[in-house]
């Protein structure tokens, strides 16, 4: 039985997150001031506690991008667990190469923090994650569902994750939250995906919804920007136009 946690909670499962060095993970010198400043929107500790993270787990971070969450996960898992980063292929697209290259450079700049990370190619269906089936305790997907929809790889990505997870393992998803009734094209264009759509896709892949909550909700997010979610911080896709307005809204409303 695999478990899907679709939303990030403001509370935690009792007993599931003992022995974690949150001070180092959140306040260590390996994190920039700007990245620490985003904690107010992303609530990393509350998020990971809700998902049930513990120090001895093998955790898969799917498509970690620039490594914002890697900064938090790596110190928490280094001594007793394992962090697997499922990133893009070195021989992929120009964007994929830049993303992977930047990620590896980040790991190299603070090797003492990141030395234990196992970086793997994960680009299903062509290049599925090369780990043993049933070897992962927890898989984490941070704001990547819209990218799957754009690439047409949602089904393959969820199947790859399902294969990697142990029986009873946990899939935790954070995603820009859209409104019911959106078309798939609207989801692709704006990066907002309805909660019901995410749950539907995960359940179709064999996952079972176990919990959801509102810790990363943002009622100020009107979700009606011509430039989609990238209009809001940190991207500020509209440049200086209405920048103060979008800064006051903050980062997106997230499931």
Question: What residue ranges belong to the model's regions?
Answer:
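S-adenosyl-L-methionine
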Residues: 96-128
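Class I SAM-dependent methyltransferase Rossmann-like catalytic core
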Residues: 20-50, 54
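Conserved beta-strand signature within the Rossmann-like core of class I S-adenosyl-L-methionine
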Residues: 83-84, 168-177
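Conserved class I S-adenosyl-L-methionine
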Residues: 55-65
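A short acidic, Gly/Pro-enriched loop at the edge of an enzyme's catalytic core
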Residues: 128-139
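A short, conserved alpha-helix within the catalytic core of class I
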Residues: 124-125, 147-160
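A short glycine-rich, Lys/Arg-flanked "PGG" loop and its adjoining helix->strand segment in the class I
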Residues: 74-75, 154-167
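A conserved beta-strand element that flanks and buttresses the S-adenosyl-L-methionine
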Residues: 140-144
